[in-house]
Amino acid sequence: HPFLWNDMGIHFVPKKLSEVVLDSGFFKVSEKIIDDPEKEIDSNVIFDCRGRHNRDLDNYDKLIDPLNTVLLSKKFKRDNNLIYTRCVATPNGWTFVIPNQDSVSYGYLYNNTITKKQEAIDDFTSRFDLDYVTDTLEFDNYVAKNFKIGERTILQGNMYGFIEPLEATSVGLYHKLCRCAWDGIFNVHSFDQCNQNIRNKMMELQNIILWHYQYGSKYDTPFWNYAKSLPFNPD
């Protein structure tokens, strides 16, 4: 769809992008295990991007979303006719189909309290003509109560929050986090106001995604009945 002048849609490989940035020579890179950032890192500001596994769960709220598991697979051949990410509704949720330079990636998202894993695998592999599943990941949908913790630490990436990838909102959220961090660090706004701004953004993303489930799909199944029943307040 058309984008605003200041927006664009891109495909990129996160690992390769990270390698380009870290190898650019613009940054001093130190590889070490960090347990307590504020005690172990000498800097004015710390951006904590350690991911979802190091979180203090008392600082997080759950987001409303019907999904919690994804099966991953890949076809090791380029599809020249596929030039965009497909989002395909299935009886148990939906599947992303992403074109890569030399392959196509698949992700079958479902709720493991509604659909058994083997049932999901069988539907995934048969529906998309796949030979095998490469990985299975369970996830939570969540947001931090405060994006600034301690004296000088800003939560970023999955350390701040995560919501399922239906609208591919992660990069936009990370950019908004940077903007809010800047505003707080340089006293454009108070950190309390910045925190409220980024939480409002996350709630907007939650509601945008919930819109997709409100009217269901062509499938009359337990998953879609559950998804349609989720509390939803777009205001």
Labelled PLM ranges:
Residues 13-130, 161, 178:
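Predominantly flavin-linked oxidoreductase catalytic cores and closely associated redox partners
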Residues 39-43, 148-151, 217-219:
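A short, glycine/Asx- and small/polar-enriched loop/turn
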Residues 130-198:
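A conserved active-site cap/scaffold subdomain adjacent to cofactor or substrate pockets
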